[in-house]
Amino acid sequence: AGLPGSCARRCGALVAGPRLARMRIALAQIRSGTDPAANLQLVGKYAGEAATAGAQLVVFPEATMCRLGVPLRQVAEPVDGPWANGVRRIATEAGITVIAGMFTPTGDGRVTNTLIAAGPGTPNQPDAHYHKIHLYDAFGFTESRTVAPGREPVVVVVDGVRVGLTVCYDIRFPALYTELARRGAQLIAVCASWGSGPGKLEQWTLLARARALDSMSYVAAAGQADPGDARTGVGASSAAPTGVGGSLVASPLGEVVVSAGTQPQLLVADIDVDNVAAARDRIAVLRNQTDFVQIDKAQSRG
């Protein structure tokens, strides 16, 4: 009761006892178009709804600025450009931290697939960005033709909670998630425009739950809504990943706390970050982890 009609809410719990470190988060499962200004209006709308619902953080999908499948150099802007500054303004006005996907230009003619994380305040706190590390050269799509990779994992602090940033295909690489956990992340956001196809939605759900278990963290997986047959327009690519819905929050034990269908929706969930330390102490996979030398770089003694 008391949440907007478009919201779904469920509280996740791993251990009994008093609630000491609760955080309310929201996932905005939107359907981005090709007009960055119109998409920025969507950010404002959903950020306002999330703030009204009492959320401290709202996570938007990859490609919030402009959907994939169209030329991106034409819309790319620097992280201090008008679109990113619009996100910062929304965060300040709504009093909520916003994580959203955008594209930034590079010197080699490509773009970076970027997340901006902007909190309320003047100056904004946090105010950071992450460039997608693992590029989607799979399933008949070659992201690296138009997108340059990032190099560095990023963790930001939102109301005392350490939040790791990842984008879409990153979710298939467990080492990034365990590294974010090593750097202190208690919650990891993955912002996606997931590709459609047989079994892909099931893979998305499974991967989010698996990365939560790998990192012993909450995972907030925000995806683009399923566009249906709306993927048309000059320069559109039918192979481009443009969303399947299925946004979810997974607990450090891999439980689904809350999940969405395929259509645009705002999810709201309460998480207890004390559960992260409890899970890491109980299962101890991070503490017991062993690092291996890459076999192709090892010198043979035989």
Predicted regions and their residues:
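Active-site catalytic loop in hydrolytic enzyme cores
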Residues: 89, 106-183, 187, 195-210, ...
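Extreme N-terminal starter segment of soluble prokaryotic enzymes
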Residues: 21-26
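Cys-nucleophile CN-hydrolase/nitrilase-fold catalytic domain and related Cys-dependent amidase chemistry
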Residues: 33-36, 44-123, 129, 195-217
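CN hydrolase (nitrilase-like) catalytic-core segments centered on the catalytic cysteine
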Residues: 80-99, 171-265
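A conserved C-terminal secondary-structure "cap"
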Residues: 276-302
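Short beta-strand scaffold segments in enzyme catalytic cores
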Residues: 101-102, 113-117, 154, 247-249, ...
